[in-house]
């Protein structure tokens, strides 16, 4: 269990410079102040593996401050990963992540980069104050559901802002915010190999397939 409750704006850094850190038991994270709990961000070779049958969860104190960063992180096996953060927090999946089980994330801010998701993924962004632009390079091998639910702020939420994403399952885009969801923000050759289903409600500004002039899918 990692509890980050500092009086200064600091974080807990795990496996920061180490290669092949192995976790054979469940990981529990809490962060109510500071900069969160962050894995493997010290250099390009740092990495961590969560053993098959184990998962990551939010503890009883919650995760309301800072970043939960799963960088260079491999989740072995097929146990679902369910994470819900609040406050001004954010969840970062990748870069160089690999997730075997279903991934369900609810957070004010969500980013995904250069990661492979082998089971269904549900991402729910709950705050519209800040724009979230994921850098892309992800492969989604099952269905992806993107929910943007916020009644405040005019921040957009985008994917593939640099590298193309590959979607091998269906994509469900549900927008009930005050701005837009963008797929293929700034990258060429994004691949949609399943159906694309859009739901828009409230005062949302829509869903875009590509955005910048050089982007394509």
Task: Show which residues each predicted segment covers.
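Extracellular beta-strand-rich, repetitive "passenger/adhesive" scaffolds
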Residues: 1-139, 143-166, 170-217
């Amino acid at each position: 269990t990692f509890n980050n409750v500092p009086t200064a704006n600091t974080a807990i850094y795990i496996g920061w410079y180490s290669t092949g850190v192995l976790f054979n038991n469940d990981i529990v994270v809490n962060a109510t102040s500071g900069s969160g709990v962050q894995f493997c961000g010290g250099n390009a070779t740092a990495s961590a593996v969560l053993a098959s049958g184990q998962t990551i969860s939010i503890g009883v104190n919650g995760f309301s401050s800072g970043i939960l960063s799963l960088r260079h992180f491999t989740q072995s096996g097929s146990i679902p990963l369910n994470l819900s953060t609040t406050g001004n927090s954010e969840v970062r999946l990748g870069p160089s992540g690999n997730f075997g089980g279903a991934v369900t994330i609810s957070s004010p801010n969500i980013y995904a980069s250069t990661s492979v998701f082998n089971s269904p993924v549900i991402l729910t962004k709950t705050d519209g104050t800040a724009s979230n632009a994921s850098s892309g390079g992800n492969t989604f091998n099952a269905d992806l559901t993107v929910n943007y639910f916020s009644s405040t702020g005019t921040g957009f939420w985008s994917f593939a802002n640099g590298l193309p994403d590959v979607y091998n399952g269906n994509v469900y885009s549900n927008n009930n915010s005050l701005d837009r969801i963008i797929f293929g923000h700034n990258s060429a050759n994004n691949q949609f190999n399943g159906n694309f289903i859009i739901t828009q409600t409230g005062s949302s500004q829509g869903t875009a397939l590509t955005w910048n002039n050089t982007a394509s899918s």
